[in-house]
Regions:
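Structural signature of the two symmetry-related core transmembrane helices
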Residues: 116-131, 207-210
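C-terminal membrane-cytosol helix-exit motif in multi-pass small-molecule transporters
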Residues: 2-6, 13-38, 219-224
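Pair of pore-lining "gating" transmembrane helices in MFS-fold secondary transporters
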Residues: 48-64, 146-150
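Intracellular juxtamembrane helix-capping segments at the cytosolic ends
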Residues: 154-167
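Helix-to-loop junctions at the C-terminal end of transmembrane segments
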Residues: 101-114, 197-198
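A membrane-interface helix-boundary motif in multi-pass transporters
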Residues: 2-19, 192-213
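Short amphipathic helix-loop junctions that connect adjacent transmembrane helices
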Residues: 70-86
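Paired small-residue
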Residues: 128, 139-147
């Protein structure tokens, strides 16, 4: 968005972004960890029990992220009537906030615990969605995007950590299953929101996302790992 606002061509903006990601990968490659799975470990295992429950929570958490990634600009443009050149500011605000919050997430989770981090994150994200949908000035909507970014930042990592520490399934398989369900949420979620927005409006669809995030916060009482 910043590069496009600076009048760079779309292709140049994409190439710069790809180059930056490749540079980060090369610089971080020396710190990657490798782990070999035992030969008798199945390649695919269906989640069950607590792992399936964690996966469903991950689906909802990623659905919230997907809503911001795919619908934030549409919301500002169509609902708040923001000029198209500024519609991407919500996306940028959300992603930058989530990135910074995720960098400091380990310290937060270590201080409050995984389950409390999920509760606080889900409540904060739900509050952010409600702020950006119910508060009219579009500048105030940016506060909502900040809250959603802060809230969503550490829900998924905490859920992945819970999946790795449970005893119902091997940790590596459980994390794989939970992450698969989670990323299904980030893929299918925006389509579900589009379907809901087509029938009930985008504000109602976003309120549905906030409700789902509140259910994540409530559901953590049944997380016994």
């Amino acid at each position: 968005t910043v590069l496009l606002s600076a009048q760079l061509p779309p292709l140049a903006s994409v190439l710069i972004g790809v180059g930056a990601m490749l540079l980060v990968m090369l610089l971080s490659a020396a710190h990657w960890h490798s782990e070999r799975m035992p030969h008798d470990t199945p390649m695919l295992a269906l989640p069950h029990g607590i792992v399936l429950f964690i996966g469903v929570l991950a689906f909802v958490a990623f659905l919230g992220e997907g809503a911001m990634l795919d619908w934030s600009a549409v919301f500002l443009s169509d609902v708040r009537r923001v000029d198209a050149s500024l519609a991407g500011v919500g996306y940028v605000t959300f992603t930058l906030t989530m990135t910074v919050a995720r960098l400091f997430g380990d310290a937060l989770v270590a201080r409050v615990g995984r389950q409390r981090a999920i509760v606080f994150g889900a409540l904060l994200a739900a509050a952010g969605v409600l702020v950006l949908t119910l508060v009219t000035p579009w500048q105030a909507s940016l506060v909502g995007y900040v809250l959603v970014g802060l809230g969503c930042a550490n829900i998924a990592p905490a859920l992945f950590s819970l999946a790795g520490h449970q005893t119902r399934m091997p940790g590596a398989l459980a994390i794989t299953a939970v992450s698969t369900l989670g990323f299904a949420g980030i893929l299918a979620g925006p389509a579900l929101i589009g379907f809901a927005a087509d029938h009930f409006g985008l504000i109602a669809a976003f309120i549905g996302v906030a409700t789902a995030l509140l259910l994540v916060a409530v559901s953590t009482r049944w997380l016994r790992v």
